[in-house]
């Protein structure tokens, strides 16, 4: 008698190939995300030096936890500008953490 595996038991073998990798922090900073978050670099710069003329603070070298907390706060509608609140709301927690890690790893201006 041959043993047969139910087809559902084979599914995990194929799932890794179907997984879609989340964009890196650098990708989000440079290109935004699929949920409508604009590229951070448009205002904060790819190197995180900010743009005082438009009120975009420097983010390079800040602690990742500080950036993540600020994004979470803005995603809840508190602080920041209307534009930043909408961008923060379009980031998943993992994407916000990736963006924060990217900026935290950059040297302070």
Regions found by a protein language model. Give the residues of each.
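Electrostatic cytochrome c docking/interface patches
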Residues: 16-34, 47, 109
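Axial heme c-ligation environment in periplasmic c-type cytochrome domains
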Residues: 51-58, 74-107
